[in-house]
């Protein structure tokens, strides 16, 4: 297992997430959990949904094994890039011209005036999807060369752009802040592209793309493109479970009290921090390695990486899950309770965060096990598993929101995460999973979790008493 690469990727993601949390702290101070914060989060939700399931998720996991196996890498890469970019730009133009229908789709529970106020923000923010697709395409080429640092660090550029906008417009009215943030998103995405282009040139990968553009005999890669699409289309569903679930939750939250969309956003941001630093960083590094190993028939080597990564993620994610549940109030207080973000809003966000954290371990381990399905071209199986999880999550949301409000939506997502994990493990191999957990490490893990939970419980009592007096 490439621990150095995992550490580098994790550090880059950590830096990006820390700047993201700082951005969210400023955003909470400037907008609180208000009408305008809800409107910006709705507008920013759609490009982020497509980014995660379309650009970063399904595209990467279909493109990498196809690119590894391709005999005409430059031609294949440029053909896929141009097709996707033209498609995404067409959608962006359509949404720019007709933003209100798509905004209504995301916020069914809002009145016509609120939809009208949010629609221009939706039109601006959606162009970020085009920018981030270019970033994702370039990042996948860099992953092929085992370079992860640029991609991991580049998200900080988006955050820094938004932080600059918040500093400049902090004292302005909420409407001006929301518009400033929307334009800052596009500036940040452009900066991410620039950073990746510099690195692509450094690794001389630009020659592959230029060669592919000049050669352009697409008939040589027709079969490769068909194979890519056969992986990509199921991959959209396979990667979409948490994202579509969160998207549905956002829609359902518009039927709840004002601030519910913001509570979900702030809590999910904290939840995403350990998921990204630990699980996504590890899976990102392992994916090209596992793809190459399986492509070369080295199955045992691939599963050896799985064994090592499983215990690394289980210990780290388990500790983060307990910390997020037991220290939720101090965490939310430290990050968000200032300015227009009140103590009441803190307590509402705390419960949502705790419900999200219940799903941290299964979602993280699902990232690890599912990469074996994608690397071995079993995208349809992954899509079927994701569908089971999505149905469970959405149906649970419809029930739990009646009794628990926004926290019920978060809990439903966690339930879907456990379903995703169990079915993914079964598909990868129940016997292999049993062999992994039969290790003596299981006893150490149980002892560690119990001891750590007791320690955190008493730490939380002391910290809450200190901050609340």
Residue ranges of predicted features:
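Membrane-embedded alpha-helical bundles of multi-pass transporters/translocases
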Residues: 1-469
